[in-house]
């Protein structure tokens, strides 16, 4: 039996991974990790929505130490104000790198993969499905093929059962992910990419700020990828 744990953070990438895993595995478990991020409450509600929508069990794990370490580093993703950017600014590598530094949670993907690996090791093995992609890999080193390769090397020594990291989006940008979401029939408008979400609409859609890097990447990817964006924004993203 093929088993997968999907690291689910609520955005386009992990939503695409969830639909993909549901199609490709016999058993799928969603794993959402809380560490005090600004969008945590919204993320949890989004996770609960897709858990019910796809009939996939959900585990939410809280890591207080990661919240403490994030505040120690001063990441804006935990209790801070994230930078506002435009689509044009995203093309400036220096701006993109500075934004990435601002929202960096110390060793987050290493920690999250370790948590998922522990769960799968307890269950007898399986795949950790992650939403790493080419667009974010350009500024986040822990979203690259090299990172996946090194983590899989580590897991050979760190687990008793056979556990590996699988990154189905690793060669896709946001446009490609948008196309995949459409192909899979995903209700992406119920996902959340925003670093500073403004709550929910009456019918349960997250309200995105429209000004943070993640909102701009989301809007640009959907518009250029599938020619539409059903996301609700407080402010229309500038792409």
Curated annotation (Swiss-Prot):
It holds the Pfam family QueC. It catalyses: 7-carboxy-7-deazaguanine + NH4(+) + ATP = 7-cyano-7-deazaguanine + ADP + phosphate + H2O + H(+). Pathway: Purine metabolism; 7-cyano-7-deazaguanine biosynthesis. Coiled coil: none annotated. Binds 1 zinc ion per subunit. It comes from the Archaea. The keyword Transcription regulation does not apply. Keywords: ATP-binding, Ligase, Metal-binding, Nucleotide-binding, Zinc. GO terms for molecular function: ATP binding; ligase activity, forming carbon-nitrogen bonds; zinc ion binding. Its EC number is 6.3.4.20. Its cofactor is Zn(2+). Zn(2+) binds at residues 194, 209, 212, 215. ATP binds at residues 8-18. InterPro entries: QueC (IPR018317), Rossmann-like_a/b/a_fold (IPR014729). Belongs to the QueC family. HAMAP family: QueC. Catalyzes the ATP-dependent conversion of 7-carboxy-7-deazaguanine (CDG) to 7-cyano-7-deazaguanine (preQ(0)). This is 7-cyano-7-deazaguanine synthase. The gene is queC.
């Amino acid at each position: 039996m093929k088993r997968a744990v999907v690291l689910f953070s609520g955005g386009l990438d992990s939503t695409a991974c969830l639909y993909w895993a549901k199609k490709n595995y016999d058993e799928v478990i969603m794993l959402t990790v809380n560490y005090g991020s600004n969008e945590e409450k919204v993320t949890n509600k989004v996770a609960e929505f897709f858990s019910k929508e796809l009939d996939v069990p959900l585990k939410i794990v809280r890591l207080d130490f990661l919240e403490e370490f994030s505040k120690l580093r001063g990441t804006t993703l935990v209790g801070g104000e994230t930078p506002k950017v435009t689509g044009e600014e995203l093309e400036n590598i220096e701006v993109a790198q500075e934004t990435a530094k601002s929202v960096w949670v110390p060793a987050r993907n290493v920690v999250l993969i370790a948590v998922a690996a522990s769960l799968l090791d307890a269950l007898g093995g399986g795949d950790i499905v992650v939403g790493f992609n080419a667009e974010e890999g350009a500024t986040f080193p822990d979203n690259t093929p090299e990172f996946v390769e090194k983590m899989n090397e580590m897991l050979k020594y760190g687990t008793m059962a056979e556990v590996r990291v699988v990154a189905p989006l690793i060669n896709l940008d946001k446009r490609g992910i948008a196309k995949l979401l459409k192909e899979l029939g995903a209700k992406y408008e119920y996902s959340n990419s925003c670093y500073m979400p403004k709550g929910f609409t009456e019918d349960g859609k997250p309200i995105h700020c429209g000004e943070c890097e993640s909102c701009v990447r989301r809007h640009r990817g959907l518009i250029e990828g599938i020619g539409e964006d059903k996301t609700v924004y407080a402010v229309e993203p500038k792409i």
